[in-house]
Each structure stands twice: as C-alpha cells, then as structure tokens.
Regions:
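Alpha-helical transmembrane segments of integral membrane proteins
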Residues: 21, 58-65, 225
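Structured inter-helical modules in multipass membrane proteins
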Residues: 82-84, 89, 95-186
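Alpha-helical transmembrane anchor segments
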Residues: 10-44, 53, 184-268
Length: 268
C-alpha cells in the first residue's frame, strides 16, 4: 500500500530510498559532528572566549552554507525551467512539421511527404518511449534511432523545391536537432561530487562548533532538525538537476502529444 501511495505521486520506492538516504546522511553528519565537537571543546572549558568565538564562527559557516545551497538551487531550478522551455519548443516544431508534411502530401510529392509525416509521428513516439527514459538514467544519453529518424525526414524533403512549406520544414528539422542536443546538455548539468563533499564538510564544521554546550537530547533534536532542513534542500537540488527523471520529471507525453498527433499514435 505504501508503494502504491508513492506511485500515485510519481514517486518510486528507489527514489524514496535515495532521497531518504540524503536526509539521513545530513542528520547523521550533523549529530555525530556535534557530539565530537563537544568532546573536543570541553577541554577548553576554562576559556570563556571559546563559546563566543564558536557562536560567531557558526553564524558565518551557516551563512556560507545557506548561500552556496541557495545559489545552487537557483541554478538547478533555472536549468529545469530551460529544459521545459526547450522541450516545449521542440514539441511545437514537431507539430508544425507534422502539419506541413500533411499539406505537402496533398500539394506535391505525396508519397515522400506522407512517409515523412509518419516518420515525424514515429520520432515523437520514440522520444516519449525511449529517449526520455534514457536521459533520466545515471549516464544520460540520446536514443540513436531518434537521430536516424530525423535524418530520414531530411532525405524525404526537397528544400530546393521552392515552396515555403518545404523550406520552413527543413529549417524546423535543424531546430529540432539543436534542441535535441540541448536536452542532453540539460540532463548532464549536475553538481560534481566534490561540491557535495564541501557541503557535508561545512555542515559538519557548523554542527561541531555548536558543541560548545553539552549535547542534551533537546539540543540534538534541534540540530537534527536543522540538518534535516539542509538535507531537504540538497535533495530538492538533486531533483531539479534531473529534469528527465525523478518525481518532478518533465512529462514528455503531455508536451509532445497534441491532439492531432496523439490520434496517429496507437495506444499501447
């Protein structure tokens, strides 16, 4: 029942375990660092300046930590929004090509244009069924067949024929190819592992400096709550950096399937 409830929100058990692990690691790092920090700092209990100095350093480190996370979250969200805009533009170009191929099939060279129209439908279906899931993998990649379909559509066109539609469709194919490469770039724009090591180090240092006072149960609960909040921000960054996978992934079907093309794709 729990797994079914997760699926309702587009959340798999694997994603739940990974995201939960991020939060648990953040809490564990903070609590352990606080206990260790107390063991170290109590040796200087006779120096009254230590707690004041520690409080000042904590404020600075927490401020730096929040600044880095806020900056990264903003960049990740902007990348996510650009991925949506790119997919929307690609879907628009696919719809225009589909419509233009339909008109060209009635005007001249009907067999080739009709073939190109069916290739456009096959390309959209391939993007939804194969390329989108591949972009959501740990190592994002484009689907080879989708590239072949675009090449076949080019071969079916005659851009020197003099018609406005054939020229526009040829240009549209170039735009689709460019946007398709952009999708791969959006999928690969992720924070390096070194960044997360720095974040974990700053979190541990902040919590260790909070150890100037004995770690009572209530203090540990408060520190764990703070670390949990940091962990939630980290997993939100992680989700935004995966625009084609995860529980906030862009829905390819809703973007790429307008009514006139959805009718051409047989339901599975």
């Amino acid at each position: 029942m729990f797994v079914a409830a997760l699926n309702i929100f587009g959340y798999t058990m694997r994603e739940f375990v990974v995201d939960g692990g991020i939060c648990l690691v953040a809490v564990g790092v903070g609590v352990v660092a606080n206990v260790i920090g107390y063991q170290i700092m109590r040796r200087a209990a006779g120096d009254a300046s230590i707690p004041k100095l520690a409080d000042g350093l904590v404020a600075g480190l927490v401020g730096l930590l929040c600044f880095l996370l806020g900056l990264t979250l903003n960049d990740a969200r902007e990348n996510y929004i650009r991925a949506i805009q790119s997919a929307t533009e690609e879907a628009l170009q696919c719809r225009l090509m589909y419509q233009d191929f339909s008109v060209l099939a009635k005007l001249n060279d009907g067999e080739k244009s009709a073939k190109a129209q069916s290739l456009a439908v096959e390309y959209v279906q391939n993007v939804i069924d194969h390329e989108w899931p591949q972009l959501g993998e740990s190592t994002p990649r484009l689907n080879e067949k989708a590239g072949i379909l675009l090449t076949q559509m080019r071969l079916a066109l005659n851009p020197t024929g003099g018609t406005f539609l054939s020229t526009r469709t040829w240009t549209g194919l170039g735009i689709v190819e460019h946007l398709r490469e952009s999708r791969l770039r959006f999928a690969m724009e992720q924070s390096p592992s070194g960044f997360w090591i720095i974040i974990a180090t700053l979190l541990a240092m902040s919590c260790a400096l909070m150890g100037s006072v004995a770690p009572t149960k209530m203090r540990l609960v408060l520190i764990a709550t703070f670390c949990l909040g940091i962990g939630i921000v980290c997993l939100l960054i992680d989700e935004y950096e995966k625009p084609y996978g995860g529980w906030i992934a862009i829905d390819a079907q809703s973007i790429f399937l307008p009514s006139e093309m959805s009718e051409a794709i047989a339901p599975k």
